[in-house]
Amino acid sequence: MDGLLAYMYTMMAECRAQGRVLKRDFLVQCGRSMELFPGVREWFARINAFGERLGVEVEHYVLSSGLKEIIEGSGIAHEFKQIYACEFYYDESGLAAWPKLDVNFTNKTQFVYRINKGILDIARDKELNDSMPDDSKRVPFTNMVYVGD
């Protein structure tokens, strides 16, 4: 089993075993308590201003094997054009029912291509896989800076 799907499944199973509910709101709330390193909040405005001085529009994205709901709760979520991360599917009562998306080491490449081609919607797989001339791509790879951990 994929390790990320396993940890997401285990989160659901452990919550059930402990009589806890795993809902989106709970995970978003976890993100609100996330501590950021000094300077992280200010970094976005600084790099955006630097890009503007050079005539470059800067966009920020997250490609993470963490949980999207937690990242969305963080104090910097609004800085990102798109957040690609693991996320749950929720049933009609709002409970996490199954892993909806996992973003692992290998498929992070897919999300870099989404940014490259400007196809940010994860439901548009066919278009993502269609051939596209380089001069039609929204963000050339040469214009990307990828910072990883």
Region locations from a protein language model:
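A metal-dependent, Asp-based hydrolase signature
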Residues: 1-52
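C-terminal cap/substrate-recognition subdomain and adjoining C-terminal extension
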Residues: 31-61, 65-149
